[in-house]
Amino acid sequence: MTLQRERAHRPEDLTRLFVERANEGDAEGMALLYEVDAIMAYPLGQQTVGRANITGLFEKMVASRPHFGLEEPLPTLILGDLALTSTPALDVAGARAQVARRQPDGTWLRVLDRPDFRG
C-alpha cells in the first residue's frame, strides 16, 4: 500500500509539513519535500546534495527522536515559479532560509535549503 502524504500547495506549507513529518519520524516524507537534485547546506560547513543523500541525513536525524517546534514564517517572496521562504530559528541556528520551486502540478518543493546560518 502506498502512503499518501499531503503536498505543499503553497511555499509556506513546506515548513509545516517538514515539522509534522520530522516529529512523526518520517525521514522519507521529509525528503519528499525536496526536488531530486536539491542541495541542503547541512551539516554545518558541508553540503548534502540530492534527495537520496538528504533522506540518509534525515534518517540519522530522526533516529534520535528530536522534537521540532513550528517556527513562525517571515513573509515569502515569490517570483514566477521560485519562492524564498524563511523563518527565525527557535534554536541557536539564527535563521533558516529555503528556495522552493513550483512543480508542473502546481505544488512546491524545496530546491535549496540553509537550515542553519551559524556557519
Task: Enumerate the predicted regions with their spans.
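Short glycine-dipeptide loop
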Residues: V36
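A beta-strand edge to alpha-helix "cap/lid" segment located at domain peripheries
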Residues: M1-G29, I39-G119
